[in-house]
């Protein structure tokens, strides 16, 4: 069932806890960290996507997909790519000052079947595996 989760940052040299984030719910996905901005993106099964500072654990924003999420978020080229069980594919800006209540996603579409795999971008093409197909979406055209 759905339970409480805990995201913990450990010092790689000492193994000591640097910070922890207790708002995350049950998750089976991995986090994505953008090396340029230091932003960490995590998601949970209840459909929330969290943007944190990877060094401090400070929360910048939380986005609600309103559907269960099995896949991990993916970050590339200043964007966050997420898919959910309702088949929604969403691309969000990878920036600390994004405001989910007032700012729109960069791109949003429904694939008509659940997305259980992690979206991946390569050479300007977004690849999305659904329950039934593998799609290649030209990122600039959104096709």
Feature roles, as predicted:
Residues 1-143:
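Noncatalytic, solvent-exposed loop/strand surfaces
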């Amino acid at each position: 069932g759905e339970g409480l989760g805990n995201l913990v940052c450990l010092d790689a040299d000492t193994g000591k806890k640097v910070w922890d984030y207790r708002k995350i719910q049950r998750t089976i996905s991995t986090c994505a960290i953008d090396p340029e901005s230091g932003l960490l993106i995590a998601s949970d099964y209840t459909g929330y996507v969290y943007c944190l500072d990877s060094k401090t654990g400070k929360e910048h924003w939380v986005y609600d997909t309103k559907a269960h999420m099995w896949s991990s978020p993916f970050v590339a080229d200043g964007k966050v790519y997420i898919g959910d069980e309702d088949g929604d594919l969403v691309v969000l800006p990878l920036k600390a000052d994004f405001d989910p209540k007032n700012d729109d996603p960069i791109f949003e579409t429904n694939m008509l079947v659940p997305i259980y795999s992690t979206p991946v971008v390569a050479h300007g093409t977004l690849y999305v595996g659904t329950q039934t197909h593998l799609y290649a979406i030209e990122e600039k055209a959104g096709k």
